[in-house]
Amino acid sequence: MSLLTEVETPTRNGWECKCSDSSDPLVIAASIIGILHLILWILDRLFFKCIYRRLKYGLKRGPSTEGVPESMREEYRQEQQSAVDVDDGHFANIELE
C-alpha cells in the first residue's frame, strides 16, 4: 500500500486502514512523480561530483588546440606539467636542536 492512498480512521475496535481506490488518476500521477523524484535524487547523490564538475567547467577538457602547431602544443603541455610539479628548492629545511 502506498502512503498516499492510506487513511487511518478510528473505529470501535481500534485504528483501521481504509484505502481509497488506487486507480484514481491523481494518485497514479503522484506515485509516478514520487518514484521519479526518488530515482533522480539517488542518481544525483551517486554522481554529484561528475555532474556538477561538468556544469561548472563545461564539456571541454581544456583549451582548443585546433590549428596550433605540434611544437606549440608540446610546449604548452610542458608548461602545464611544470606548473603542477612541486619544486623542492622553495622549501627550507629547519632542524630543531
UniProtKB/Swiss-Prot annotation:
Signal peptide: none annotated. It comes from the Viruses. InterPro entries: Flu_M2. GO terms for biological process: protein complex oligomerization; symbiont genome entry into host cell via pore formation in plasma membrane; symbiont-mediated suppression of host autophagy. It is a single-pass type III membrane protein. Forms a proton-selective ion channel that is necessary for the efficient release of the viral genome during virus entry. After attaching to the cell surface, the virion enters the cell by endocytosis. Acidification of the endosome triggers M2 ion channel activity. Cytoplasmic tail plays an important role in virion assembly and morphogenesis. This is Matrix protein 2. The gene is M.
